[in-house]
């Protein structure tokens, strides 16, 4: 391969993250395209130019911003997935629905859809939510930070599952669901985000995900991992919190 080579990343979110990072650093950068094969990749991970790898059980500690030449979407790949892997990507769909103010894409509109029958519409519609945000803030200096809803806690929970004997190897989506619900509750306590909306989101997600119970020592260990979150500023742990269903801070 040389500097004019093109790397094709065909696979799920982990593969497009690693492949994008490899392309971005090989010979100081070659072009790449992403062809995501999971719902998670199609609506979120393959878009936006964030590339990276985990380091010492910590999420995305090494990486760069570099957008792919193209992201090619084909929902036929979803037919190859187990039901569990298919659903894994739904956490990011719900996140996007909570961040948009477009009436036909809000959470209340999303829950009227059938995840499996309406997958093509869901992929195209909710990936566009992320792409529009990224287009206005490619390097996450301002508005793009809202895409981290659920991820400060979610990434720490996911990292904890790598090292814990009690919470073992959670999928990304399941960890992010825990993060979304918890950060919505923090939004309620801090900014008076409606508690009834927190409950509605939680009850809906319970239809798709097994919400694990965390004990006090688990929570303390997860907090310790949050200290390493890449969004932090000094000793300050940063969250994306909501005032309403269409506004984030």
Language-model regions: role of each:
Residues 91-94, 193-242:
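C-terminal charged capping/lid subdomain of soluble metabolic enzymes
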Residues 243-249:
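Conserved small/polar residues in nucleotide/adenosyl-binding loops
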Residues 115-163:
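Oxyanion-binding "anion nests"
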Residues 1-33:
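N-terminal small/polar loop signature for handling phosphorylated ligands or for N-terminal nucleophile
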Residues 170-209:
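Active-site pocket-lining segment
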Residues 90-94, 122-133, 147, 180, ...:
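Short alpha-helical scaffolding segments that buttress acidic/His motifs in well-ordered protein cores
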Residues 20-113:
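A glycine/threonine-rich phosphate-anchoring loop and its flanking beta-alpha core
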């Amino acid at each position: 391969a040389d500097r004019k080579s093109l790397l094709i990343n065909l696979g799920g979110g982990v593969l497009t993250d690693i492949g994008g990072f490899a392309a971005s650093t090989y010979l100081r950068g070659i072009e790449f395209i992403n062809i995501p094969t999971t719902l998670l990749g199609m609506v979120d991970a393959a878009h936006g130019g964030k590339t990276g790898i985990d380091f010492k059980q910590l999420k995305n500690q090494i990486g760069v911003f570099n957008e792919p030449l193209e992201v090619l979407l084909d929902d036929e790949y979803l037919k190859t997935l187990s039901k569990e892997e298919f659903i894994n990507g739904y956490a990011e769909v719900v996140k996007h629905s909570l961040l948009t103010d477009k009436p036909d894409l809000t959470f209340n509109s999303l829950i009227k859809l059938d995840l499996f029958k309406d997958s093509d519409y869901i992929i195209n519609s909710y990936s566009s939510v992320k792409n529009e945000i990224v287009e206005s803030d490619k390097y996450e200096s301002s508005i793009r930070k809202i895409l981290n809803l659920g991820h400060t806690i979610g990434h720490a929970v996911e990292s904890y599952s790598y090292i814990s004997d009690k919470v073992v190897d959670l999928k990304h989506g399941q960890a992010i669901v825990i993060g979304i619900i918890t950060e919505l509750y923090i939004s309620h306590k801090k900014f008076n985000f409606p508690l009834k909306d927190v409950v509605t989101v939680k009850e809906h997600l319970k239809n798709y995900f097994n919400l694990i119970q965390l004990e006090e020592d688990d929570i303390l260990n997860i907090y310790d991992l949050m200290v390493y979150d890449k969004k932090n500023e000094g000793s300050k742990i940063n969250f994306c919190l909501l005032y309403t269903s269409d506004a984030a801070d």
